[in-house]
């Protein structure tokens, strides 16, 4: 997947608008997420490994908030010949267009249905795997429980839900420590103080992370019997829940 360098916040902007997954972001997204999210490549690769283990023949897989299709591609490579369908859903037309190009670059017998839609409007059915890869944190908090419930109801017994998120920590000392570690990670990847500050301002009204306890409670209350964090680096984590 080709990507330009992320310089969206490299110059002083008089008025910072809320972050959007628009054409500008879609064009630099791979570079942006690689330099901003520690462990992203490992998360993507392991999502494919989970697919190999959990996806059952003739079932559906849902990548909710699919962006450029990295998770979908990782899954598709692992489930050839199983007669499954993947539903890759994103509400950004710019992301869907680039995802279409990325998927077309690889031959596969697995059908991918690309949908430009709100993930809250998608019917989940016959699902052996659902992925929410840095997606839930952008939904209004009051909509998150209902989405998890609908996912659970549409999953097959033994199905897996993978949720990757930035985390909020109830302990202020830990929150500050891991925030600082993440900022150092971004600096080490070439982001300036101006870029870091302006992007933080753009995100503050649209991204609201939950704590690990909130995630676990939400999953348990909506029926999932098994839950674990399988990956964490600083304030970013990926979790699995099994029906």
UniProtKB/Swiss-Prot annotation:
Keywords: S-adenosyl-L-methionine, Transferase. Pfam families: Methyltransf_25 (PF13649). It catalyses: prephenate + S-adenosyl-L-methionine = carboxy-S-adenosyl-L-methionine + 3-phenylpyruvate + H2O. One of its GO terms (biological process) is tRNA wobble uridine modification. Its EC number is 2.1.3.-. InterPro entries: CmoA, Methyltransf_25, SAM-dependent_MTases_sf. SUPFAM superfamilies: S-adenosyl-L-methionine-dependent methyltransferases. S-adenosyl-L-methionine binds at residues 40, 65-67, 90-91, 118-119, 133, 200. One of its GO terms (molecular function) is carboxyl- or carbamoyltransferase activity. Homodimer. Belongs to the class I-like SAM-binding methyltransferase superfamily. Cx-SAM synthase family. Catalyzes the conversion of S-adenosyl-L-methionine (SAM) to carboxy-S-adenosyl-L-methionine (Cx-SAM). This is Carboxy-S-adenosyl-L-methionine synthase. It comes from Shewanella frigidimarina (strain NCIMB 400). The lineage of its organism: Bacteria, Pseudomonadati, Pseudomonadota, Gammaproteobacteria, Alteromonadales.
